[in-house]
A protein has these predicted regions:
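Residues on the lipid-exposed face of transmembrane beta-strands in outer-membrane beta-barrel proteins
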Residues: 53, 67-71, 97-101, 155-163, ...
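Transmembrane beta-strands of outer-membrane beta-barrel proteins
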Residues: 49-51, 79-83, 109-115, 199-203, ...
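Bacterial N-terminal signal peptides
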Residues: 21-32
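Outer-membrane beta-barrel translocator/channel fold
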Residues: 85-162, 282-320, 330, 417-424
């Protein structure tokens, strides 16, 4: 698990029809690039630390203020520590901390990560239903929401084993040595995991709970989850791949806290990246990125004593990455299927680099994207059903590489809402 994946999992900003959020994001960026807020006084030159303020506004929190920090190379060159937290005008608060990619002495190819997130949102916009966390929201379900209190707690541990094949066969292999700049050459992938790419097997334990607090009742939801993932990153760069593919399959076994029902979830994803020729002086890289993601819950049933995961852990669409024009978990059912496409452009023109360099920050490039998502949920895993009455969203965004972290800002539109989101890492 990488730093960006951990942060992406829980710490995000999403606004609904709210222009004010964009203003606060601009203010936050200006504050973050002020040298008074940066700390880099480390005795070890291999450690790089940044602490920045966070200022934003959205419909769930109102105006919020916080602090975020990351230290790269603490203890080990490939490792990182991070922490973020905020409080807001409507008494919302959240904190997240993590340690990423640490190795044990004399244990090769194993990387360990830990993550904690807690939040209290007294004015959270959630869907109207009689079973918060478990109500089915099918493909044709109406959009109805209300304000409710939501308390969330997440704890996660992960062990990652990088298989000794492909790129990892090289004695000098390191997770930190992959290209992150468009000028850096990327290895040409083959079609065999033995010869190229990074293959990993991940074991993950997660405990997550979410309480929905209404005037008349409190609904407690949550689950303990054990998850295995097998992935093959057959690209030349994790952040800006110009060619190649990625594939991942995962299985989750969960036990719900409140009814002790057990469930199982299967997920798969495959992505392809296709470089377009750059014939002009205004572009550094042009790429078309395509993705197919799917999920199925074989233990699913429709009864009140359901053997199915909560909506925030199950087969769902909407939110930050899949059907981005709908809010998180807008659609939730037994199965899900979604196509995603992006056109990504890194231009030669980058006005932030010179300004950031003077302040001691590294912002080597930004990337513009046009994207479209198309998919649906269904009560059974049926290929023909998936391709009937599919939901579509479209939008545009910008990605900025700042201090080695890729910050993604997306604006997406659907038939229900216009959404903007700020998050870490590419959508896929």
């Amino acid at each position: 698990m990488t730093l960006v994946t951990l942060i992406m999992a829980k710490f995000y900003i999403q606004s609904v029809k709210r222009v004010g959020a964009l203003c606060w994001l601009a203010v936050s960026f200006l504050l973050a690039t002020h040298p008074a807020w940066a700390t880099q006084n480390n005795s070890d030159p291999g450690i790089r630390t940044r602490v920045v303020p966070l200022v934003f506004s959205n419909d769930n929190t109102g105006v919020a203020y916080g602090l975020g920090g990351v230290s790269l190379g603490v203890g080990q060159p490939q490792a990182a520590l991070f922490a973020l937290g905020f409080t807001s005008k409507n008494d919302s608060k959240a904190v997240t901390v993590g340690a990423v990619n640490y190795k044990l002495p004399h244990v090769k190819r194993w990387y360990f990560s830990g993550f904690f997130y807690g939040s209290d949102m007294p004015q959270y916009g959630y869907f109207i239903n009689d079973m918060p966390g478990y109500a089915i929201r099918g493909n044709d379900s109406p959009f109805e929401s209300q304000r409710t209190g939501v308390n969330t707690l997440t704890k996660r541990l992960q062990a990652r084993w990088v298989l000794p094949i492909g790129a990892a066969k090289d004695p000098g292999f390191s997770l930190t040595r992959r290209p992150i700049l468009p000028e850096q050459p990327q290895l040409s992938p083959t079609t065999h995991p033995e010869q190229s790419g990074i293959s990993s097997l991940r074991f993950e334990w997660e405990q997550q709970s979410r309480d929905f607090i209404e005037p008349s009742k409190t609904s407690e939801t949550g689950a303990d989850v054990f998850r295995t993932k097998l992935d093959w990153d057959n690209t030349g760069s994790r952040l800006i791949p110009a060619s190649g593919s990625r594939a991942r399959i995962s299985t989750s076994w969960g036990k719900n806290h409140e009814n002790h029902k057990r469930w199982r979830l299967y997920e798969a994803s495959v992505s392809g990246f296709f470089k377009l020729p750059v014939k002009s002086a205004w572009a550094k890289q042009q790429v078309v990125a395509l993705n197919l993601s799917l999920a199925d819950t074989p233990t699913w049933n429709d009864d009140a004593g359901q053997a199915r995961p909560p909506d925030y852990l199950g087969a769902r669409l909407g939110g930050l990455s899949r059907l981005r024009g709908y809010r998180a978990s807008r659609f939730f059912d037994r199965s899900a299927w979604v196509y995603r496409a992006e056109y990504r452009l890194i231009p030669q023109w980058q006005p932030l680099t010179r300004f950031a360099d003077k302040l001691g920050y590294r912002i080597p490039w930004w990337q513009f994207a046009l994207f479209a998502d198309m998919g649906r949920v269904a009560p059974s895993f049926n290929l023909a059903r998936f391709h009937e009455d599919m939901k579509t969203t479209a939008g545009a965004g910008v990605r900025i590489l700042a201090e080695g972290l890729l910050i993604r800002v997306d604006f997406a539109h659907s038939d229900e809402e216009f959404l903007s989101a700020v998050i870490i890492d590419q959508a896929f």
